[in-house]
């Protein structure tokens, strides 16, 4: 007996309900928490890393499509945002969502061990089924900010997560 299956490879998923407490959960959490607390976000490496962010609602839409479309049977699909950007540009977008004018990202002199320099997913195969991402980076950050504003007890999260990454030797000085 054969079982129908589909494999989905997700790029960097963003949106509300992304953990505040996961020290390694990414740029949206790090930058939003920093701006929310009136601090400068940490920009690792030189900020020119490329990332392919995708909104959680677009991921849900992609999953529903492959569940319902027989052309997806036994196939593998990349699920990405379709518009890769640099970490610096992402930080500028977060600053814009938070109403911060003239923000210029400054690298902090550290890097996260194990981070990939550039991440970009080829979504053309999924697009051939009629799917395309419809939410922008701005949409994802705005949604996360709204969820962040409804949270409580997050005052020391940035320090906690940075310390945790240093303890695990994940956060290191650039040499």
Question: Model-predicted segments: where are they?
Answer:
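Active-site "substrate specificity/gating" loop of NAD(P)-dependent dehydrogenases
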Residues: 19, 23, 46
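Conserved beta-loop-beta element that borders a ligand/cofactor-binding pocket
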Residues: 1-17, 42
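Short beta-loop-alpha junction of Rossmann-like oxidoreductase domains
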Residues: 16-19, 125
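Short, surface-exposed helix-loop/turn micro-motifs enriched in polar/charged residues
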Residues: 2, 20, 133-136
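C-terminal substrate-binding subdomain of Rossmann-fold SDR/epimerase-dehydratase oxidoreductases
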Residues: 7, 33-175
